[in-house]
Regions:
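Extreme N-terminal basic, low-complexity initiation segments
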Residues: 2-4
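Conserved kinase catalytic-core helix
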Residues: 455-485
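Noncatalytic N-terminal accessory/assembly modules of large enzymes
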Residues: 14-267
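Catalytic activation segment of kinase domains across protein kinase-like and atypical kinase folds
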Residues: 478, 483-529
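Long, compositionally biased intrinsically disordered regions
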Residues: 193-200, 204, 538-593
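Active-site-adjacent segment of 2-oxoglutarate/Fe(II) JmjC oxygenases
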Residues: 380-398, 510-548
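Conserved ATP-binding subdomain of kinase catalytic cores across diverse folds
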Residues: 206-452, 464, 474
Length: 593
């Protein structure tokens, strides 16, 4: 990791720059602290962009391990910078570091300092993070935090995103050739004319239901988006009276650059920018204007998810909090209830019916046969936060010290939380405070979904469940518990894993064939008659515990029967240990050119 070099402390002058009047010690501390926080954020932001800017070089050099290392470093950067800034502030403020009256003045001065800056919301979130670390705030303290539930962060955006425009008057392939020429890399395209021709063909196919000619213009963001092994050009395609998103996916193969896919379906672009994907590395001059532009492509995508997928995970949490509590203020009579699905052995899971997320609290005691400790569960969630999620792991955001009105909880749920989650749930007057809570997008549990839909959709879901296991395995993730209840189906119909307490690396498992019974007593034994170690996995047993109908079982075995064999897993382990990196395309094969 590169050491963080935050800007040095601002000079603690005795005189006001405006009036040249002597400052009181408190005034000097306010100025010092507020400028120190601003400078600390700008130091963080510069470091964030420096890491992000490496993505182009990683792509050009096919340095996929380096790209993965950058992704982890950038995720960890925020907390490292906050810790460094907090230590500096504690030294600057000394005994007054816990003085809320002083912090209220720091808050006011900080607001003045950032008033004319772009991406003010990022500055504000950084400030809030620091005050919450100093005071362990339960809920929100408006005197020392920036709170504006009714104002969206994008309301103030006036800085348009930089983009390139292309008018289409005739030869569409020539326009795409110009597009590729406008986005050069240190390595050439293997066959740019062929790529342009294929793009023209595919866009004609995908927009065949538009009026002729379907394409009148293109508009692409200047910034290239990078993630894993691909680079993306993102923008809009215009017809006579409509527009659609357009994403051109580029790959760097051993033979050079080539176009891998063209995506104009809004649903597939939403998946690309979704909550099951790792974060993009896109060097944006300002983030808010990019979010505004992306919202024109994906109007139903929550703002918090767009900030998050752009790598601004802390801002994503801020926006999720803002939107959630604005929703609660509009629906004060609606109650939190148990989430649909089987009761969790490790987590208490609840939801608000009108809001598309679930809340997960770790139980004080886990039901048999779960044996792990609370710290192990938290570690699993941290692992997912840092790992490549390959579109199959839901992004679980950790919130601390959340405060809710006690009256908004259904009686049965309230009783369960107070009795079974005492380490996490505290009562404070008429409120409940959750010291540790994961919030995730709500999915329909797969076991329920299969009972509710027609056979064709059930078959598609169970086949995608098998594909999800393969995608995770190739990224070195073994779910641990393959039961259908631990997977959910997204609105796009994708199978997503969301129960992480038994998740582990594929390379940590010992995949074994089931021993053959040596005599009748062993064959008739009620339990396992053979020794089973903690990390032993028997793939042949998987289908026995899924509870599938004969039709669904047959469909799963036909499509993905190899995942129920020891040989497939052992071969995969060898590949992973040899350094093979999985490439899981974030779009269906039908969109590839």
């Amino acid at each position: 990791l590169i050491p963080i070099a935050l800007p040095g402390p601002t000079d603690m002058s005795e005189f006001s720059s405006e009036s040249m009047q002597p400052r009181t010690p408190d005034e000097a501390r306010v100025e010092l602290a507020s400028t120190s926080i601003r400078d600390a954020f700008e130091g963080y932001n510069a470091h964030f962009r420096a890491i992000t800017q490496r993505a182009r070089r990683r792509f050009e050099q096919r340095d996929w391990l380096g790209a993965r290392s950058d992704a982890v470093e950038r995720i960890e950067l925020y907390d490292r910078c906050v810790a460094a800034a907090g230590a500096r502030l504690a030294a600057q403020l000394e005994a007054q570091s816990q003085d809320k009256a002083l912090w209220a003045r720091i808050h006011a001065r900080y607001a003045e300092l950032i008033a004319g800056l772009l991406d003010q919301e990022l500055y504000k979130t950084f400030f809030n993070t620091l005050t919450r670390r100093f005071f362990a705030t339960r809920g929100v303290d408006a005197a020392i935090e920036f709170v504006a539930l009714s104002i969206a962060p994008t309301d103030r955006i006036t800085h348009p995103v930089a983009r390139r425009s292309y008018a289409v008057a005739g030869d569409l392939a020539a326009v795409f050739a110009r597009v590729l020429a406008d986005y050069p890399f240190a390595v050439p395209y293997a066959d740019p004319q062929d790529c342009a021709r294929k793009l023209a063909e595919r866009i004609g196919e995908q927009l065949a239901d538009w009026e002729a000619p379907p394409v009148r213009g293109l508009e692409l963001m200047e910034t290239v988006f990078y993630r894993e092994r691909r680079a993306y050009l993102v923008g809009r395609v215009y017809g006579e009276s409509r527009f659609a998103p357009i994403v051109i996916a580029l790959m760097h193969t051993e033979r050079g650059l080539r176009v891998d896919a063209l995506i104009t379906e809004r649903a597939q672009v939403a998946v690309l920018f979704g909550y099951t994907r790792s974060y993009f590395h896109a060097d944006l001059e300002t983030v808010g204007d990019a979010v505004v532009f992306l919202r024109t492509l994906l109007p139903h995508k929550p703002v918090d998810e767009l900030y998050t997928v752009l790598g601004r995970a802390k801002q994503g949490k801020t926006e999720r909090y803002r939107h959630l509590f604005a929703h609660l203020a509009r629906h004060p009579e609606e109650a939190f209830v148990h989430a649909d699905g089987e009761r969790g052995m490790v987590m208490a899971v609840f939801t608000l019916p009108s809001y598309p997320v679930v809340f997960k609290l770790i139980r004080d005691r886990f039901a048999y046969p779960k044996t792990m400790a609370r710290a192990e569960v938290e570690q699993k969630y941290r692992l997912v936060f840092h790992h490549d999620r390959v579109g199959r792991l839901v992004d679980a955001q950790l919130f601390r010290h959340l405060r809710f009105a006690r009256r908004q909880f259904a009686p049965a749920l309230l009783d369960e939380l107070l009795q079974g989650c005492r380490e996490t749930v505290q009562t404070d007057g008429e409120d409940l405070v959750f010291s540790h809570c994961y919030i995730e997008r709500r999915l329909r549990p797969l076991n329920l979904y299969l009972r509710e839909v027609e056979p064709a959709r059930a078959i598609a879901a169970i086949v995608d469940y098998g594909q999800a296991i393969k995608d995770l395995a190739r990224s070195n993730i073994f779910p641990g518990d393959l039961l259908l209840k631990n997977f959910g189906i997204s609105r796009a119909g994708r199978a997503i894993f969301y129960d992480y307490d038994e998740l582990c690396f594929v390379t940590e498992c010992r995949f074994r064939a089931l021993p053959t019974a040596r005599h009748e007593d062993e064959e008739l034994h009620a339990g396992a008659w053979y020794h089973v170690d903690e990390n032993d996995v028997f793939p042949e047993q998987f289908p026995q515990f899924l509870g599938l109908s004969p039709e669904l079982r047959e469909a799963l075995l036909e499509a993905h029967g190899e995942i129920f064999t020891v040989g497939w897993w052992l071969a995969l382990q060898e590949d992973i240990r040899a350094g093979a990196l999985a490439d899981v395309p974030p779009y269906p094969s039908r969109l590839r050119v």
